[in-house]
């Protein structure tokens, strides 16, 4: 049984759904799902669960993301990125000092209004489709967490590289647009690269072509991060040998461990356990065939 998480290096001009289709074909299974959409024109880390690893989705999808984004001042667009129609222009020049001074106001908990051109849905319809039809929707502003935000390079006149670590659901193009508003200069996101999604990082990412080459060499299993490693952020809890069968059958075992999720072991990794009121039960079965 082939299972685990593969970290795909998604190129620009390819949708996250297209990556899933390719991964299904390469690993020859329909049990595939990605851990967070990347816009088609964005690039970078796209973790994809394969086989039984899809059971870990709820425990991995909320992890922090890290991005490198190029912010361009002097023009805003209707999509807040370089693919949209220009909405406003300005000849104003933004300096490094001006940008650095405003960035701290965008760290911590901030409120974002998701762009109309997005994968979010309203009444079962994507905001993107509603935007194309020219329809308005109620304000869907929400809080997100910006853990860190800094300028890492100046790329030219009115163009800077930002590094952002943030919570799930943060729109970097909206962040770029809002930074422009704060400085009184229209801005948009010119390019986006996701460098990390939780524990899944750029240096462990493989292109679809590289995955296909590994398959041809009979080395496809090398491309997968195991379910055990993917759950390594959880504390470990070991059961005695006589509790193995009861645990596998869903029966609870008494424990002094604090309430919360854990990696449950009985010699081998069994899966994700849940401790509650002095008992632990196997919540996500990841052992055996």
Where are the model-predicted features located?
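Structural signature of FAD isoalloxazine-binding scaffolds in flavoprotein oxidoreductases
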Residues: 58-73, 137-151
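Extended alpha-helical targeting/anchoring segments
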Residues: 118, 122-146
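Active-site phosphate-binding and catalytic loops of NTP-dependent enzymes
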Residues: 29-35, 109-116
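Accessory RNA 3′-end/elbow-binding domains used by RNA modification enzymes
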Residues: 1-11, 17-38, 42-45, 63, ...
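Acidic, low-complexity central loop/insert segments
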Residues: 59-111
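Pseudouridine synthase
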Residues: 119, 126, 131, 158-203
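The conserved catalytic core of RNA pseudouridine synthases
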Residues: 23-29, 43, 47, 136-169, ...
């Amino acid at each position: 049984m082939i299972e685990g998480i593969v970290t795909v290096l998604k190129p620009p001009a390819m949708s996250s759904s297209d990556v899933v289709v390719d991964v299904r074909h390469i690993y020859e299974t329909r049990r595939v799902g990605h851990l967070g959409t990347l816009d088609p024109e964005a690039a970078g880390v796209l973790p994809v669960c394969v086989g039984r690893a899809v059971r870990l989705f709820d425990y991995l999808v909320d992890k922090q993301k890290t991005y490198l984004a190029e912010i361009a001042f002097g023009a805003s667009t209707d999509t807040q990125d370089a693919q949209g129609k220009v909405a406003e222009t300005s000849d104003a020049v933004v300096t490094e000092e001006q940008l650095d001074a405003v960035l701290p106001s965008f760290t911590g908990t901030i409120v974002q209004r998701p762009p109309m051109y997005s994968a979010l849905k309203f009444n079962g319809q994507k905001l993107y489709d509603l935007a194309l039809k020219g329809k308005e929707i109620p304000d869907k502003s929400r809080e997100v967490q910006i853990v860190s935000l800094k300028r890492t390079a100046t790329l030219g006149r009115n163009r800077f590289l930002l590094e952002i670590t943030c919570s799930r659901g943060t729109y970097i193009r909206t962040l770029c647009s809002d930074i422009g508003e704060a400085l009184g200069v229209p801005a948009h996101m010119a390019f986006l690269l996701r460098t990390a999604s939780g524990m899944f990082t750029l240096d462990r990412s493989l292109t679809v072509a590289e995955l296909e080459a590994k398959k041809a060499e009979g080395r496809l299993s090398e491309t997968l991060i195991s379910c055990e490693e993917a759950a390594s952020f959880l504390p470990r809890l070991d059961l005695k040998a006589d509790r193995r069968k009861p645990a596998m059958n869903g029966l609870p075992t008494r424990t002094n461990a604090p309430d919360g999720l854990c990696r449950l072991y009985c010699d081998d990794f069994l899966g994700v356990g849940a401790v509650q009121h002095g008992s632990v039960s196997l919540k996500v079965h990841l052992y055996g065939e």
